């Protein structure tokens, strides 16, 4: 094997963030949530599935199967050229392609492919399904940013896919430039990026109905490295390795969408502040006041079910709050990042003291919500700033009741 080929293979084996194949059950659950809210959500629509070769992708197979049920007008799927993809080291064309007169041994590696299903029974079997797909090679490699795939985006009413995780942010920008509806899979932690958060705050996108705060299983190409614990968890969830894929799991994967669903309109059932302090199931909430931040005018709420329903001020809540967020109940104000316009204090350089007493000068406190304490906590990390002591919490979303 040449040095270049060996390098390509090595890169492919560690491309865990990009080559994730979504399971049929996860697609079905999410799509059903949209249909429950609006049975005609897909009717007479053009759906684009970029990054989804029907030879491998469950997205294309799922929507082809339900083409008539959903009343689709047109289904378009595109795939990325193997030689433009680090996972291409594992690629080999299938019989679906090689048996077709259009097969080109060079283009199969250098060019992307486009698959189209329309309201045409091409094989005369009386139904419109995946057997009626028409395909052709794209002029380019199938990158979603290319002119030809962007033109397909502009033709589509809805884009649905699991984009490469490393390209989630540029893919999201590409979607908003096209002003299309979408449902895509990404990391729940993506909301901590300024550009992503801006869309969430403005109610231009939100979490999907399913897969939140739970494991999602993905297929990966054979030969890609998987942590033993993740492989074992996928097996326990019912996905042992098979002839086609190995399987892994991700605990922070979720759907991001601007398609409406009923679960985002379900109000959180919350206790009052007094009842939380008395009856909360969390020991660190019962009998204590909610701590206030030193650098934001807000109280810290460490658990979603401990949000005081009668509090009228600003609250900092975990980013998993978005799993339960009802835009009719709460307003999203900001995120506790350095770029937040709600910060009321900026700290000079700080000394971070870890649990073992090691000291280091840092600037990290400005990117976290800070709680002032009277004395250094025992056995925990803390910050020193000008003789004052602070502990930092995880990133928080700042919210306020809509009726406050």
Could you say what each language-model-derived stretch is?
Residues 1-404:
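Class I S-adenosyl-L-methionine-dependent methyltransferase catalytic core
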């Amino acid at each position: 094997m040449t040095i270049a080929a060996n390098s390509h293979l090595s890169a492919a084996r560690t491309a865990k963030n990009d080559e994730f194949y979504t399971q049929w059950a996860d697609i079905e659950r999410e799509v059903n949530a949209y249909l429950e809210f609006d049975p005609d959500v897909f009717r007479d629509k053009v759906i684009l599935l970029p990054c989804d070769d029907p030879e491998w992708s469950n997205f294309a197979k799922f929507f082809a199967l339900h083409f008539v049920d959903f009343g689709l007008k047109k289904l378009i799927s595109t795939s990325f050229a193997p030689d433009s993809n680090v996972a291409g080291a594992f690629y080999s064309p299938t019989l679906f392609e090689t048996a077709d007169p259009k097969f080109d041994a060079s283009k199969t590696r250098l060019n992307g492919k486009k698959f189209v299903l329309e309201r045409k029974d091409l094989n005369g079997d009386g139904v419109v399904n995946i057997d009626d797909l028409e395909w052709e090679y794209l002029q380019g490699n199938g990158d979603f940013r290319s002119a030809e795939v962007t033109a397909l985006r502009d033709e589509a009413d809805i884009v649905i896919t699991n984009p490469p995780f490393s390209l989630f942010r540029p893919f999201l920008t590409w979607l908003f430039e096209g002003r299309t509806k979408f449902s895509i899979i990404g990391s729940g932690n993506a909301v901590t990026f300024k550009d992503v958060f801006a869309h969430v705050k403005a109610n231009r996108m939100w979490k999907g109905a399913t897969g939140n705060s739970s494991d999602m299983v993905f297929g990966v190409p054979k030969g890609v490295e998987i942590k033993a614990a993740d492989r074992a968890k996928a097996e326990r969830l019912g996905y042992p390795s098979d002839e086609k894929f190995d399987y892994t799991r991700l605990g922070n994967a979720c759907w991001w969408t601007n398609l409406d669903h009923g679960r985002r309109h379900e109000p959180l059932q919350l206790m009052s502040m007094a009842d939380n302090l008395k009856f909360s199931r969390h020991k660190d909430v019962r009998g204590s006041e909610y701590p206030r931040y030193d650098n934001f005018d807000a109280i810290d709420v460490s658990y979603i079910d401990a949000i005081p329903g009668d509090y009228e001020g600003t609250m900092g809540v975990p980013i998993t709050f978005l799993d339960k967020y009802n835009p009719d109940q709460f307003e999203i104000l900001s995120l506790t990042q350095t770029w937040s316009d709600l910060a009321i204090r900026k700290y000079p350089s700080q000394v971070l003291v870890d649990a073992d007493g090691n000291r280091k000068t840092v600037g990290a406190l400005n990117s976290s919500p800070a709680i002032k304490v009277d004395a250094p906590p025992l056995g925990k990390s803390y910050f020193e700033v000008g003789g004052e002591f602070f502990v930092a919490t995880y990133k928080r979303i700042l919210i306020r009741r809509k009726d406050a």
